[in-house]
Amino acid sequence: VETNEILDTSVALDAKEGIITIFTLIEHPPCAEKFFDILFPETKDYVIALEIAKKLRQQGTPVGAIDMLIAAMALNRSLAVRTCDGNFKNIQVVMPELGLR
């Protein structure tokens, strides 16, 4: 398990350990029974998420708030996102520094 990546819900479902956000835990409470480190958002994460939202809206490709927040949390901490969710590719278009796996 990589320690330099956040697992999105789409990946965390099958994982036993790693780093997830509180949003993944809320989306899938059984994750609490696994060995995950849980990240909580900071003020800067919301600022970055708003920047992502503005850029996506300008391109006409808005995505869900939770995905934007997870991406923002990864960007703020220089982490990648491991995901099977295509919305993160849309985010990467406007934030190319977002690492995806």
Question: For each predicted feature, which ranges?
Answer:
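Acidic, PIN/NYN-like endoribonuclease modules and their adjacent C-terminal/linker elements
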Residues: V1-N4, A71, L75-R101
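PIN/NYN-family metal-dependent endoribonuclease catalytic core
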Residues: N4-V47
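Residues within well-formed alpha-helices
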Residues: D8, I48, I52, A71-M73
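Conserved glycosyltransferase catalytic-site signature
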Residues: T9, G64-M68, D85
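Hydrophobic packing residues within well-ordered alpha-helices of enzyme cores
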Residues: H28, A49, F88-I91
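Residue-level signal for well-ordered alpha-helical positions
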Residues: C31, I52, V94-M95
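Conserved SAM-binding loop
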Residues: I38, V63, V81
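Mid-chain, well-packed structural core segment of small domains
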Residues: E51, Q58, V63-I70
